Regions:
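Small/polar beta-strand repeat architecture
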Residues: 1, 9, 15-16, 89-214, ...
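Beta-sheet repeat architectures centered on beta-propellers
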Residues: 1-96, 184-186, 192, 196, ...
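Beta-propeller and closely related beta-pinwheel folds
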Residues: 43-66, 91-94, 197-211, 244-417
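A fold-level detector for beta-propeller and closely related beta-sheet-rich head/sensor domains
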Residues: 70-74, 228-231, 256
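Predominantly extracellular/luminal cell-surface or secreted proteins
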Residues: 82-84, 128-132, 157-159, 237, ...
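Acidic Ser/Thr/Pro-rich low-complexity disordered segments
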Residues: 88-94, 136, 161-163, 186, ...
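Hydrophobic or amphipathic alpha-helical targeting/insertion segments
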Residues: 89, 223-237, 244
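Short linear, low-complexity motifs centered on an aromatic residue
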Residues: 234-254, 540-552
Length: 617
């Protein structure tokens, strides 16, 4: 009886039917393609055991002149700088007030009321008290999260009970951090609604849906960080200044020498070569109204000077296609800017115009501010119904998973989409919310060298490739505790964030293929596997290989004829189990290779099956 070699095209293709994709793969999870063959992806471990408040959707590693490597980290609740696997809270302050005498009122529990007629806070905001005297100074001096608001009074929860009555003394100072943001988009709210337009954040401006989701943008300015929340101010933090890591970010507009600094911004970046600070969606010079289509830049090498004069290169430009500018990324030659309807190029031209702008394409979309990435000087991004690429010109990026992704995509949470790269494997990853999920739970990957796609399930909210870090890093979030952590990705082959480590389940399914010519039923009685376990750390790594037969493309798979093969590997890596005997009957079949053991790494080659004709019925 002849052997039939199973030779399959790399990548996952869901653009047709299962049967029409004969010779390809249909589905996978935690599997990538390397050199054309599927293999299990790497595992992950804790980059740091420390937690931080909120879900981090923005991360930027950068290196100071002193050699220190830091990471700016923006969450929906705070802003941090990571150094040495420790997270330092540099969240800017919105306001500092001196409270009236005995501003705290206890009721014998850990719920304490605070009176401050000069500040309107929001639920979830953070405040730090100092100067508290009396019996509860050790309890009330410190940082707290606001839990309830009623007029000029709000509540906090303390670590121990405070007796009934007023307390605190007459010299209490309350330092309020900038308002917290949402972890997801909530319908019916946004800029100009609720607490978003209060206090130091300025007047209400309507610049589109989805902006309630807290997204920070950030870029390094030498040893310093320039950063800010979307719709908020422009902040500066310098590692070498003052107390260093314990120094909070400072509002640029309040710094000595600041002139006409934007009140609002929706995106911040620093041009690599020309050293301008650039904002999108800010207020123009002489205006306090945010313009969502405005590009504005500072004077060269001067983040404090924003007034356009004959002596500066500060300036601005309104772009005309779209209703709001979404994001921007730098390539070697230019800055690429996305609106919700077009793509533009921004290039330094020198005085008097400073920057020139070109429309690269219109009638385009982008899922959100974190949906674009530049890899090897090529821009890739996820739109609302397709993928795009810019490599000299804008094109739709053909995808064998386009329908699969966008037919199961929660467009209401599109601004949660985040992207990252794994240059080691030539991959661009997008993480997104499936149709029935309000948080990220899926990923789709494009291999730009092999021009193939694959997908799976994983919840990562920000991703930065290795470079300044040994491994790619990604953020995770526990909604119940409102705490986040950073994982190091592509570490081993298991989940090392638990103790002991837990296995990562992985599988890949082929599409249906005919047994012989497909006219007759075939009886498969032997499988010659071709699986490598090179790199496995387990003592007996195994995979399950399962054949699923069926009679016709529209018929169910015959569960009764299903035969699983468990292949052990206890000999040198390049020596394989010679053969496995089975009995599986059908006109067409698919197979699955899956693993769920600890320390298992595998790569699938070209297995073979032996079959004989077995009638037409």
């Amino acid at each position: 009886m002849p052997l039939q070699k199973i030779v399959l095209r790399p990548g996952i293709n869901r653009e047709g039917t299962n049967y029409s994709n004969e010779g390809g793969y249909w589905a996978c999870d935690k599997v990538r393609f390397r050199s054309g063959y599927p293999e299990k992806i790497g595992g992950w471990t804790l980059y740091s055991a420390s937690e931080f408040w909120g879900v981090a959707r923005s991360m930027l590693p950068f290196q100071c002149q002193c050699g220190a490597t830091l990471t700016g980290l923006g969450t929906n609740l705070k802003f941090y700088v990571e150094f040495g696997a420790a997270f330092y809270d540099i969240t800017p302050l919105a306001e500092t007030n001196t409270l009236g005498a005995n501003p705290f009122t206890g009721d014998g529990t850990t719920t304490v009321a605070v009176t401050d007629a000069g500040r309107t806070v929001g639920t979830g905001d953070f405040v730090t008290f100092s100067g508290v005297t009396g019996a509860y100074a050790g309890v009330l001096n410190g940082e707290f999260k606001v839990t309830y608001i009623s007029g000029s009074t709000y509540s906090i929860t303390t670590s121990s009970a405070v007796a009934a009555g007023a307390t605190g003394g007459s010299a209490v100072s309350a330092a309020y951090q900038v308002s917290v943001g949402g972890s997801i988009y909530t319908q019916g709210t946004g800029w100009g609604a609720g607490n978003w337009s209060r206090g130091a954040w300025g007047s209400a401006t309507s610049v589109g849906v989805g902006l309630q989701l807290r997204l920070w943008s950030l870029d390094n300015y030498g040893d310093a960080l320039i950063f800010g929340p979307r719709g908020g101010g422009l902040y500066y933090w310098d590692y070498n200044a003052g107390a260093g890591l314990s120094t909070r970010g400072e509002l640029v507009a309040d710094m000595p020498g600041a002139n006409s600094v934007p009140i609002y911004q929706n995106e911040i970046l620093v041009s690599d070569q020309s050293r301008f600070v650039i904002t999108l969606g800010s207020n123009d010079f002489g205006s306090t109204d945010a313009n969502p289509m405005l590009v504005r830049w500072s004077d060269q090498e001067n983040y404090l000077e924003w007034e356009p004069t004959a002596l500066t290169q500060a300036g601005s430009q309104i772009l005309s296609i779209g209703s709001q500018l979404i994001t921007a990324r730098q390539t070697r030659q230019e800055i690429v800017i996305w609106s919700d309807a077009a793509v533009f190029a921004m290039q330094y031209a020198g005085p008097p115009y400073v920057f020139g702008f070109t429309t690269l394409a219109d009638n385009t979309t982008i899922a959100g501010p974190n949906a674009a990435i530049v890899v090897n000087n090529v821009a890739y991004w996820m739109g609302t119904d397709k993928f795009y690429v810019y490599n000299g010109k804008v094109d739709v990026l053909p995808s064998t998973l386009r329908s699969y992704v966008f037919n199961d995509f929660n467009t209401a949470q599109a601004w949660q989409v985040t992207t990252g790269a794994v240059n080691q494997y030539n991959e661009v990853w997008w993480f997104y919310c499936s149709a029935n999920s309000n948080t990220i739970d899926r990923y789709v990957v494009f291999n730009y060298v092999d021009n193939i796609w694959f997908s799976g399930s994983m919840n990562r909210f920000a991703w930065v490739d290795s470079g300044l870090k040994q491994y790619p890093i990604a953020s995770v979030y526990d909604e119940a505790t409102e705490k986040g952590q950073i994982y190091a990705q592509e570490y081993g082959f298991d989940d090392f964030t638990t103790s002991p480590a837990t296995p990562i389940a992985a599988y890949i399914d082929s599409s249906d293929f005919d047994i012989g010519e497909g006219d007759n039923f075939g009886l498969v009685n032997r499988i010659i596997p071709d699986i490598s376990f090179e790199g496995s750390t387990g003592t007996s790594p195994t995979v399950n290989m399962t054949l699923y037969p069926r009679r016709f493309p529209g018929a169910d798979y015959s569960a009764g004829d299903e035969t699983s093969v468990v292949r052990s590997h206890t000999v040198p890596v390049e020596q394989y189990t010679e053969q496995v005997f089975v009995r599986v009957r059908g006109r067409q079949m698919r197979f699955r290779v899956a693993s769920s053991g600890l320390g298992v790494m595998w790569q699938l080659g070209m297995p073979r099956i032996q079959m004989r004709p077995d009638g037409r019925k």
